Amino acid sequence: MQIFKPASGHTHSTVQKSVVNKLNFYYGGYQALKNIDMMVYEKQVTALIGPSGCGKSTFLRCFNRMHDLYPRNHYEGEIILHPDNANILSPEVDPIEVRMRISMVFQKPNPFPKSIFENVAYGLRIRGVKRRSILEERVENALRNAALWEEVKDRLGDLAFNLSGGQQQRLCIARALATDPEILLFDEPTSALDPIATASIEELISDLRNKVTILIVTHNMQQAARVSDYTAYMYMGELIEFGATDTIFIKPKNKQTEDYITGRFG
């Protein structure tokens, strides 16, 4: 039974960008993720869905080592990042280096108390880019990729807080894109936005899939169906089902997945 119309017009890729092997994650003594195996495909959008507290955001934050900020958290298993086959969860891998390769956009817009230009240039400066001409080129390119350039090109010196909520979120996306990440993580990026701004962000995500691999956490199943190529359904820290979005939404293999998607459970 077809409940939602999945995204169309984009070719599914089976080129692996990342492989998750037997991933377990613990908040102190509490196990939040249980033995997860999953593929992440290159230049595709993968949506993570499931009820509140199922582990979606916890899983997402493993990819850029956000959990390292709290000392009692710990991982087991691997997240392999191609093409160099590096296990990014290894203690020998610097989490700062991981975050240079894997950027994140959060639930609520979080611009820095700086100008529009300096918000986007911030990560570039940290990475050692100093020449003004290069900064200007990279900032413009990031703002164009975030579909924001035409709206802000004449006021790059204005404070980012003067932008609307939707513009601030696109600015955060531009900031994440400026350092050319290999993977872009979205944690419910439209939950704090109105329907018009939400539609703009969804269109942007669809456009970005041609440039970068994307993982998105969303509680909105219609959104997952609209923007994603692959979908993972999670429940109580376990990955219940993973596959092409059209398969998950039209003909899921697992009864629990079907019950969640059709609203009988969740």
Curated annotation (Swiss-Prot):
Its EC number is 7.3.2.1. Its main location: membrane. It is a peripheral membrane protein. CDD domains: ABC_PstB_phosphate_transporter. Keywords: ATP-binding, Cell inner membrane, Cell membrane, Membrane, Nucleotide-binding, Phosphate transport, Translocase, Transport. Residues 15-261 form the ABC transporter domain. InterPro entries: AAA+_ATPase, ABC_transporter-like_ATP-bd, ABC_transporter-like_CS, P-loop_NTPase, PstB-like. ATP binds at G50, P51, S52, G53, C54, G55, K56, S57. One of its GO terms (molecular function) is ATP binding. It catalyses: phosphate(out) + ATP + H2O = ADP + 2 phosphate(in) + H(+). It is an enzyme of class 7 (translocase). The complex is composed of two ATP-binding proteins (PstB), two transmembrane proteins (PstC and PstA) and a solute-binding protein (PstS). This is Phosphate import ATP-binding protein PstB. Belongs to the ABC transporter superfamily. Phosphate importer (TC 3.A.1.7) family. It holds the Pfam family ABC_tran. One of its GO terms (cellular component) is plasma membrane. One of its GO terms (biological process) is phosphate ion transmembrane transport. It is found in: Cell inner membrane. Part of the ABC transporter complex PstSACB involved in phosphate import. Responsible for energy coupling to the transport system.
